[in-house]
Amino acid sequence: MLKVQNPGITGAFLFFGEIIMKIITWNVNGLRACMEKGWKEFFLQADADLFGIQETKLQPDQISLDLPGYHIYYNSAEKKGYSGTAVFAKKEPESVRYGIGIDQHDHEGRVITLEYPDFYYVNCYTPNAQNELKRLAYRMQWENDFRQYLKSLNMAKPVILSGDLNVAHEEIDLKNPKENRNNAGFSDEEREKMTELLRSGFTDVYRFLYPEKTDAYTWWSYRFRARERNAGWRIDYFIISDDLKSSVSDCTILSDVTGSDHCPVMLEIF
């Protein structure tokens, strides 16, 4: 069981006598733009204990957020207006790491790790392989190094990973698998790297709970009325250490929440 050290966490609630911790992940596709579409209202209503976002596309001095009760951590890309992650945490962590400790990967603001007494929370924005798989070779190196990073954390304590991992793992995870075979996000190579991760002591929470659920997507192209037609991809995940599977209460895709081309995903765990 995942032990929540502070029973007074605001927003955590009792579930058959256990404290439920709520974690949300959302690729906001530009935090400032998303704020104009209701991000803060959703954030306050969600009342999550941990809230990880990806593609912030800003430097911390470009935004001022008044979020009482939250500690805020940014990891911004050196290239302005690109990539970036942030975590909003009700409980101050024991430590915070930015990046994965490998220089070639740590200039784009892709990973933030918060350490708590009983687990690590990792917020990640995985590099896109890009059109014609131009960045696939780099993506493969990233996958290998990031997997080793997660495995090293997992040796110390359980891991909760969330974020836009930029891959639809199986055919059930996107609307049009045949048409997208070997496109970025659905190449054989990227899918195999996800398989390798899940064979390394980790679990895709949504598929663990809902192995046969179809039409469950987290990203839709802005083109061709894709969201209206639900022609999407499931590329935003919660991945947890296998040891935490028995602690999961639910994992929910909040597809009705707009403001980005992605929607939030919520994990409830005790």
Regions found by a protein language model. Give the residues of each.
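Conserved beta strand-loop-helix elements of the APE1-like EEP
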Residues: 80-95, 223-246
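Metal-dependent phosphoesterases centered on the DNase I-like endonuclease/exonuclease/phosphatase
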Residues: 71, 142-231, 235
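Structured beta-strand-rich core segments of catalytic domains in phosphoester-bond hydrolases
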Residues: 57, 62-129
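Surface-exposed cleft-lining segments at the edges of enzyme active sites
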Residues: 101-102, 127-143, 178-183
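Active-site-proximal beta-strand elements of phosphoester/diester hydrolases
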Residues: 21-29, 118-130, 162
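Active-site beta-strand termini and strand-to-loop segments that position acidic
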Residues: 90, 114-117, 241-242, 267-270
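Active-site beta-strand/loop signature of hydrolases that rely on acidic residues for catalysis
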Residues: 27, 43-61, 121, 150-171, ...
